[in-house]
Amino acid sequence: IYFASMKNFQNSKKTGFLKKIFIKLCRILGFEIIDQNTFEIVTIDKKINDEATIIGKNSINLPLGIVKVTRPVKSLDIIIRTCTSVNMLTQNKNRLFEKEKIEYTLRTIRSLLYSAKSNTQLKNLKISFKVIDHNSSEENLKKIDSIFKKFETEYYLINLDVSKFEKEIKKINERGQDISSNQISNMANIHQSLLEAKNCEDLIYFVEDDYLHQRNSISEMIFTYERIASQLNKEIIICPSDYPYLYTRAGITQNFLGQNYHWRKVDETLCTFLTSKQIIEKYLSLIHI
């Protein structure tokens, strides 16, 4: 993509014949034209600060230009791991704001639903929700259900059976200490999430029930996945939370431009991330929890 100015065009809503021909020619040649008088991208009828990216087709960032999407996203499955009966895996700590765990769970789900519906382009993408719950009370499960009903969104609930995974889970951590029952149930939930990914079509977002999302979080991840995966020509993993512990040591990295944010390459992450079914199927046998 190349950006050219239109300084010689008058600031008028009346489009002349030559201007129409010029714009059509630019579209054919793959140029995007910015009218510096009106700050419009006239070839796509957008203002300069409007969202110019078209999901599944191209990713546009000003002033860097366009990336043709060669890896379009087909669908997104959001798998939420919930456990409202446990405040923290380490019970001697308190959460920020010191509220009941269900409050964090409900706010997480609500923020995800808002984010999934905030961008009109996401209406063309199949987005499914699945909740894998461990040991929440019936009262709390009803509260979760009411959130989905409020947003008129269907979801699938799985009640976790920890016993199915106990033999696969290591009972001693890297420090040689026994792991707690809460940690075992958390690992079992992760196992179940990965197994559920086999039934998904394309992208999967694994998320714990204590992450608040901005209105553009889902669209940013989708647009960024398409952009970077198309640039690199391979499947990737996106970690939306920039954890402080990742800055405790210096390391060689790479920086990428997403839709509205900069992203950097990391070597590790916690268990809230977005990736593709292809990645899960390729590496599932290598994952040990």
Features from the language model and the residues they span:
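Membrane-proximal basic amphipathic "stem/tether" segments
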Residues: 2-60
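N-proximal low-complexity "stem/linker" segments adjacent to membrane-targeting elements
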Residues: 36-114
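Short loop->beta transition adjacent to catalytic acidic/histidine clusters or analogous donor-positioning motifs
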Residues: 76, 115-130, 153-155
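Short beta-strand/loop segment that forms part of the nucleotide-sugar
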Residues: 125-136, 159-162
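Active-site-proximal specificity loops/subdomain of glycosyltransferases
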Residues: 138-144, 148-200
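Short beta-strand-to-loop acidic/aromatic patch adjacent to the donor-nucleotide binding site
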Residues: 201-212
